[in-house]
Amino acid sequence: LHLSLRRQRQMCKETDRIFCRHTPEHFLDVARLAYIFSLERGISCPRELIYCTALLHDIGRAEQYTVGTPHDEAGARIAETILSDLDFSSEEKEAILSAIREHRSSSDEVPVLSQLIYEADKKSRNCFLCVAEPECYWSPQKKNMTIQY
């Protein structure tokens, strides 16, 4: 595990958070769902790209909680450091960083990797089991009240 990733995880425990937490299980759920979506839709996107993006997409959460920087902005900056140590092409690195920056947007204008991560991020949540669901700020349309995947 990359040292920067480990350090971010330690800083972002979310022990007092009553809503969905950003855990390794969440990151892997997002990765698996995004990969399933790509296969179902016939989208040609390497699995490694999807998994790397999903594992890093919320890495800026600790900075958001402590400094107030939006986690997508902070995450892209932090991920850039991690990606410099990984064996991806410059185009692949830019695709990952772009998807991290844009993973909160449901727009059709963003690249397909961003769309996959956005949808998987939302679908990964089990709102139907959550005791905090009534207080959640998500709109009813975003909440997952049934099992789909």
Task: For each feature predicted by the language model, list its residue ranges.
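Helix-centric, low-specificity signal for extended rod-like, repetitive segments
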Residues: H2-L3, I50, L97
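Short coil-to-beta-strand
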Residues: R6-R7, R47-C52
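Catalytic-site beta-strand/loop segments enriched in glycine and acidic/polar residues
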Residues: C52-R61
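Divalent metal-dependent phosphate-bond-processing catalytic cores, especially two-metal-ion Mg2+/Mn2+ enzymes
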Residues: E14-R47, L56, Y65-S90, E94-Y149
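Single conserved hydrophobic/aromatic residue that forms the stacking wall/gate
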Residues: L1-C12
